Amino acid sequence: MMGLDLLVSLLALSVSPCIAATRSPLQIPVLDTQPIETGREFTLRHMLHHGTYRDPLLHKRLDIRPDTLLWAASENGEKRESVPRFRVSSRPINIHRLSDRHVSVVEDYLSIARMTSSAVTLSSDYWTLDEVDAPDVTDKETVLSLAKMTSNAYIMIPGSGEWFDVVPPFNHSDSFGWDSDGLRGHIYSDNTNSTIVVVLKGTSAAIFDGGGTTTNDKVNDNLFFSCCCAQGGHYFWRQVCDCYSSTYTCNTACVRKALRQENRYYRAALNLYSNITAMYPQSNIWVTGHSLGGAVSSLLGMTYGLPVVTFEAVPEALPASRLGLPPPPGTDPSSPQARNYTGAYHFGHTADPIYMGTCNGATSVCTLGGYAMESSCHTGQLCTYDTVEDFGWRVGIGTHRIREVITDVIERYDDVPTCAPFTECVDCNNWKFFESNETTPTPTTTTTSTSTRTRTSTCKTPGWWGCLDPTTTPTTTATTSTTSTSTCKTPGWFGCKDPTTTSTVPTASPAPTITPTSPPTTTASTTSTCESPGWFGCNDPTSTTTFPVPSTTSTSTPCSTPGWFWGCRDQTTTTSASPPITSPP
C-alpha cells in the first residue's frame, strides 16, 4: 500500500482545476444540533447550473428566498407558483462507503483509475459501514414528496433574481442560451440545514431532438447505457464515440475516456457536489432524480456513499462499472449490481420499458428516437410497482413521464412496494470487451479471395466453344499433350475439315480356325480411323470378311469433296485379295 499512498500524495500536490473551480466562499451552518426529527419540511434554497458541451467550465448558482416567485416548467407546461414545501420522513440505513470522503481524496482515486484504466483497490482499512439518516422509503408521503421534487424544473421570473458565478466569471452571462446547455441541480433544505436534498434534472420530456437539453441528454444516455457508444446496433442509434472494433467487440478503455470527459453529466455532477459540500460542510446530503437524472444521482451516491432515491431511472450498473469507482473489499468492480449496502433505492413500474431495460428493440420508441438503451441492470435495491399485473397496463414509453408516475402510480397505490436487490442481472452478455491504448489503432484482419485467369498466348483460331489453337496444359498429377501435325486451314463445326492422309501397311492374315459349330461361320471386322463421323457413330464403310469369303483391304485417300456438315463425299476403292488355297488333307 506504500506505493499507492505515495501516488495519492503526489496527485494531491497538484491542484485539480475542477476542484479549485467549484470551491465557494458561501458556507451555511447547521442551525440546530438537536436530534433529527422523523418528519421535516424541505424548501427550495438554491438552483445550481453546470455547463457541459458548450461551456464545460460554466458553474452558476441562483439563491431562492422564501418570497421568491418561480415559473414551474413541467411536462404539462409552465405556470407561476410560490416556492414549494415538501414533507419527508427519515430512517437509519447502513451504507458501505469510504472512510475519507473528502472531494480531493475521491478525485485522486478517480484520477488513478483514469491513468491505470482500472478502479483503485483499497484495503478494508479505507472502508467503513456507517449507519446514516436516509429517506424512509417505506413511507408513501416521503416517496411522493421526493417524486414531486424531481417533477419540475424551476426558472426565475425575469427580474426577480440573479445568477451568481460560482467560479470566476468568463462572460458566460452574455452568452445567449447558456441555461439550455448543462446539468441543473435543485437544492432543498430543511429548516435547520441539517439535511440537504439534491435533485438532478433528467432527460427532457421530448424523446426526439427539440428544445432544452434533449440533444445533450441523448448523447449522455448513449454513452452511459449502450454497450459500445451506440455502435454495432440499430441504424437509428446516435453514435457518440468511436470505440467499436468489430462485430460485438468494443474497446472499454476508449469508452471510459469518453465517459470521464469534462462535458459529460457525471463530471458535472461531481463538480456540483463539490460546490454543495462547500456550502453545507456539516449537512447530511440526500440525492434524488428522474430518468437520466436518477441514474446520475445513483452514480454520485455510489461515489461518495450517499442515500439515493430515484424514479424511473435508466439501469446504471453498466456505467458504474466503467467509471473507475473504488469497490469495497470482496466485491467485483465489473459487477456493481452485486454490491450490498449501497444506500440506493430505485422506484419504477413494470410498464415502463426504460426502467425495465427493454426499450431497445428495432421498432421501440427509444431506438427510433436515436437512444441506445441497452443496459438492464440496476445497482442497489429495486422498488417496483407491478402495473402490468395490477392494472393491466401495456408497456409503453408514455408511462415513463414523472407526472404520470406521480398521479397514476404512486398516488393510486395504497402502499409503496417492497424493495429488494437483483444481483443476478448481466449486461451486454453477447459482447467482447478488451483494453487498448486509444492512440494505437486496432489491427483488423481482412481475407480477400482473388481469382486470376492467365492466357498463355493470343488465340489465333477461335472456335464456338473455345480456342482451336494447339495448346499444352501442364498439371501436377498427369501430363496430357495434344499435338497436331499441321495447322488447321479449314475449321469445321465439330473439328478440322482439312484432308488427312492415312497409310495402311498390309499384314498377312493368319489362317482361319475352323470350329465345328453349326453354322461354322466366324466374322472378323477390321476398321481404320474414322474419317466420316456421324451423329451416333462412324459413317466410314467397313469391310467384313466371312470365311470362306476372301479378306478385304480398304485403302483411303485424302478427301477432295467434304460434306456440308460432316463426312467426305469422295468415292472409295476396295481391293480384294484371295486368301491362300491350302491342299485338302
Swiss-Prot record:
Localisation per UniProt entry: Endosome, Multivesicular body membrane; Prevacuolar compartment membrane
Ranges per topology, Lumenal: 22-585
Record has Lipid metabolism as a keyword: yes
Chief location: membrane
InterPro entries listed in its UniProt record: AB_hydrolase_fold (IPR029058), ATG15_Lipase (IPR050805), Fungal_lipase-type (IPR002921)
Taxonomy, superkingdom: Eukaryota
Top EC group: hydrolase
Main function: Lipase which is essential for lysis of subvacuolar cytoplasm to vacuole targeted bodies and intravacuolar autophagic bodies. Involved in the lysis of intravacuolar multivesicular body (MVB) vesicles. The intravacuolar membrane disintegration by ATG15 is critical to life span extension.
Family: Belongs to the AB hydrolase superfamily. Lipase family.
Protein name: Putative lipase ATG15
Gene it is expressed from: ATG15
